[in-house]
Design a protein with these regions (language model features):
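Single-stranded RNA-binding regions, centering on S1/OB-family and related RNA-binding modules
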Residues: 1-205
Length: 205
């Protein structure tokens, strides 16, 4: 289920703790605001005993920090790190080239443990929140057909080529290995829609 709560339109970043009317200054607490969010979305229940968020739900999170190996996001008062491999089905090497602080992203809650009310733990994924769209994209590529893409990563297992937001693992070409970022022509040798993978061979680079 996708959680489209109205609170996302009016985020509470700070709880006002006091106002100095003469100076026109308000004192706020971000930690208190985050505690309120955690209580509302992870701990409180409705009249039927249901929590607002459960594992498997999709919700909107806010990027609060980005480093090369991944991004930190805040989801209703909890900050959680999402590693590079859970940000995209594409083979990225640096998250800072794709995300900025303040970005809004949809995330899928893979795991949610609230057994310790003071230390709620989450496991989140950006790429799995868009899994259906990725399946539609990957299904457009037919085995035997030739497509043009760009090299995004070279590893010990082969060359990753990206086209139309889909990655394809290719065998090392017999000719000189292409450089990262260079355009190449790829023949699709196989597709696995269940595991969301393509593999092929570079026929021109």
């Amino acid at each position: 289920a996708i959680k489209a709560h109205g609170v996302m339109q009016k985020d509470i970043d700070y709880v006002v703790k006091g106002i100095e009317t003469d100076a026109g200054v308000a004192a706020g607490s971000r930690l208190e605001a985050m505690r309120q969010r955690r209580r509302e979305y992870y701990l409180d229940t409705d009249r039927n005993g249901h929590h607002q968020l459960e594992a498997g739900d999709i919700a909107e999170a806010r990027v609060v920090s980005v480093i090369r190996p991944g991004a930190f996001v805040e989801l209703f008062g909890i900050e959680q790190f999402i590693p590079l491999e859970e940000l995209s089905y594409l083979r990225w090497v640096d998250a800072t080239t794709h995300f900025r602080v303040g970005d809004r992203v949809l995330v899928k809650i893979l795991e949610l443990d609230r057994s310790d009310r003071n230390n709620i733990s989450l496991k989140l994924s950006v790429k799995q929140a868009g899994e259906d769209a990725f399946k539609q994209a990957i299904s457009r590529f037919k085995v035997g057909n030739i497509y043009v893409g760009n090299v995004t990563m070279i590893t010990a297992v082969g060359v990753f080529v990206s086209f139309e937001n889909v990655s394809c693992l290719c065998q090392f070409p017999k000719r000189k290995r292409p450089a990262i970022g260079s355009p190449v022509t790829v023949r699709i040798l196989g597709a696995d829609l269940e595991r969301l993978r393509l593999w092929g061979a570079i026929v021109y680079s």
